Every structure is written in C-alpha cells, then in structure tokens.
Curated annotation (Swiss-Prot):
Pathway: Cell wall biogenesis; peptidoglycan biosynthesis. It catalyses: di-trans,octa-cis-undecaprenyl diphospho-N-acetyl-alpha-D-muramoyl-L-alanyl-D-glutamyl-meso-2,6-diaminopimeloyl-D-alanyl-D-alanine + UDP-N-acetyl-alpha-D-glucosamine = di-trans,octa-cis-undecaprenyl diphospho-[N-acetyl-alpha-D-glucosaminyl-(1->4)]-N-acetyl-alpha-D-muramoyl-L-alanyl-D-glutamyl-meso-2,6-diaminopimeloyl-D-alanyl-D-alanine + UDP + H(+). Belongs to the glycosyltransferase 28 family. MurG subfamily. UDP-N-acetyl-alpha-D-glucosamine binds at residues 10-12, 124, 195, 295. One of its GO terms (biological process) is cell division. HAMAP family: MurG. GO terms for cellular component: plasma membrane. The keyword Disulfide bond does not apply. This is UDP-N-acetylglucosamine--N-acetylmuramyl-(pentapeptide) pyrophosphoryl-undecaprenol N-acetylglucosamine transferase. Pfam families: Glyco_tran_28_C, Glyco_transf_28. Transmembrane segments: none annotated.
Length: 366
C-alpha cells in the first residue's frame, strides 16, 4: 500500500499526520509513505527526522482580503497542482490524506482530479479556507469537534477525533520528570505556547515569578526556541522562581505529558486532543491571531464542560495566570472533577477511527 500525506505550517497540522502514519504502519508493515509539504514550514525538519520521504512544493496561503498577492497565490496553486499531478502519477498512491494548512490544497485537489481516494482531516472547530475548499472535491472529511460538521457536506463527514490523542495514550510509562530537573511526586504544571512559543504567555510567566516562589507546586516552562534567550535574560533580571525549570523546546513532549497535573497553553487542536485523551485539566489561552478566532471556540468547548479555565489573551497577566493555576491545583476536589471532565471529552481511539475511514475508502475504490 502507498499513501501520500500532506499538511504543514504548524505542529497542529503535522503531528496528527505523523500519528496517523504510525497507526497505518501498525496495520501494514510494508506500507510506503510520501509526505508533501513546503520548505518553509515546520514540516520539513519534523518529517525528515522521522525518516519519512519528503517532497517540497512552493505554495502560499490566500489572504482573506482581495490583493495582488492572491493573484500570485492562484498562479502558485495551479503550478503546484501540475507538479503534484506529476508526483502522484509517479508515486501511484492508493489514497491521499490532507491534515490542513495551505500546502495540502494543491496536493489533495490534484489527487481528486486524478480519481485517487482522498480524505481531509480537520482538527479545529472552525475549518480553515483550504479544507473548506477541498471538502467539495474529497471523498471523506474527518472532524474532531462536532461544531465543525456544519461547515462541510453532511454526507462526507465522519467524526474521528485527532490521531495525536491515540499516540499520547499509547505511550507506556513515559519519561521521568527528573530528566528535566524537576522533582518526582510533586504537583507539576506545564506551561507552553504551542510549537512556536507565544510572547504574551511568556510575559505573564515572567510577571508571576514572585508569587510562584510561594507555591508548593513546580513548573516546566517551555518558551519556544525563538523566545528562549529573551525570556531567560528577563528571568535573570526578575529573579526566577526556584520551583520552575525553563526549556526552549520539548521534542518528546508526548512522553512527558502524563506526568503533568495541569497544562497551560494555547487552545490548538493538538493540545486539546492530547490533554483530553489523558484527562489533564488546563488553563487555555486561545490565540487571537488564528483564522476566524477558532482557538477560542476550541477552548470554550472545554471551558463549558468544566474541563478547562479559559483566559483571553487580552485579560492575561501574571496575577490572572497564577490565580487560574491555583484554582485548579489548590483544591483537590476541583482537580479531580476537572480530570474526569477532561477525560470524558477525549477520543483515545482517534487514530484507529481515521485508519478505518482509509480502509473503507480503499475497499470501495476496488
């Protein structure tokens, strides 16, 4: 069996694709994959590090307002479709799956025009432009939030959840926090701002240092590589809390995730899939810079079920952040209730569900 996977730009599109690849390999040892992405996104380094063959194409996303740049984007899209058709004819895949980001536009569109079975996977509650466009041409649309189904042709929609959920649940044991310089047996908070970090979260963490020094819990604070030097310099000046460890990036995050009692971060789809699958309460700070403010919709779906505390970025400061963490951690009853609520929203068998969509498509294509 041969499968083409495409998705990129941010970790939220890439990591679900990798989790899906692992699931297919679990069922078919001889499967061959080709990952199509861009040179500029995070996908090239991440995918090649996993030893998966990678092909780069040149494509940019559409601006939501009319502009000359969109004319150039259309030209790149058409060129990308032509290039993808040639690559697909060469590779001869049994199916093509797009996991979001503008790069999968020409890939999945080209596959549909060649009559190759196609799936798109939408991680968010509000879909992006690329997946909305592709939904007209693909065979199946896999979703992770019920709210997303109204944006797609009803007969194509299948609720699968996010494959990353299955990946974190399947990890046996996990890694010890001592490897990161943290103590075992102590309540621990993970704070991070997504795959590229988030400056407003960093500012709030720096501002809460004096209060954090008085707490009996500990914090792992992942700044994002871009922000690391600036943050460590500010912490040195401010006086970092001794119960906090700072890292630029955590490559094996799924292997550590089970060890955390609370997660503080953005409301990206991958983060939500992981923490709900493991039943981890959270403080969610939706990014206001994403398409149609979809992270706030993601976050509210947890907040309304008492699985998370939702803080808007416009309201974020050091005091508000540490109060939100305290609300969860300093009352054992609240902590346990939120764990149960979070777990009830998880889809731990998401990767298998998505694999079953592929299997069914292949069966009907015969």
């Amino acid at each position: 069996m041969r499968i083409v996977v495409s998705g990129g730009g941010t970790g939220g599109h890439i990591y679900p694709a990798l989790a899906f690849i692992k699931e297919v390999k679990r069922h078919h040892e001889d499967v061959e994959f080709l990952y199509i992405g861009t040179e500029k996104g995070l996908e090239k380094n991440i995918v090649e590090r996993e030893g998966i063959p990678f092909k780069a194409i040149e494509i940019t996303g559409f601006k939501r307002k009319l502009s000359f740049e969109n004319v150039k984007t259309v030209m790149r899209f058409l060129k990308g479709v032509k290039e993808c058709k040639e690559e697909l004819k060469r590779f001869k895949p049994d199916a093509v799956i797009g996991t979001g980001g503008y790069v999968c536009g020409p890939v999945v569109y080209a596959a549909s025009k060649l009559g190759i079975p196609t799936i798109i996977h939408e991680q968010n509650s509000l879909p992006g432009l690329t997946n909305k466009f592709l939904s007209k041409y693909v065979d199946k649309v896999a979703i992770c939030f019920d709210e997303a189904k109204t944006h797609f042709p009803a007969e194509k929609v299948v609720f699968t959840g996010n494959p990353r959920a299955s990946e974190v649940v399947s990890i046996k044991g996990g890694r010890s926090l001592t490897a990161l310089g943290l103590a075992e047996g102590k309540k621990t908070v993970l704070i991070f701002g997504g795959s590229r970090g988030a400056a407003p979260i960093n500012e709030a963490v720096i501002a809460m240092q004096n209060e954090l020094k008085k707490r009996d819990y500990q914090v792992l604070y992942v700044t994002g590589e871009v922000h690391y030097d600036k943050v460590t310099a500010a912490l040195e000046k401010e006086g970092a809390a001794p119960n906090m460890v700072v890292q630029p990036f955590l490559h094996q995050m799924p292997e550590y995730l089970k060890a955390f009692d609370v997660v503080v971060g953005r409301a990206g789809a991958t983060t939500i899939a992981e923490i709900t699958a493991l039943g981890i309460p959270s403080v969610l700070i939706p990014s206001p810079y994403v398409t149609a403010n979809h992270q706030e919709v993601n976050a509210r779906s947890l907040g309304e079920q008492n699985a998370a505390v939702v803080l808007k970025e416009s309201e974020l400061n050091g005091d508000r952040l540490i109060q939100a963490i305290d609300h969860i951690l300093q009352d054992e009853k609240t902590l346990e209730e939120m764990k149960i609520r979070a777990k009830s929203l998880g889809v731990p068998d998401a990767a298998e569900r998505l694999y079953n969509v592929l299997k069914e498509l292949k069966h009907h294509a015969k």
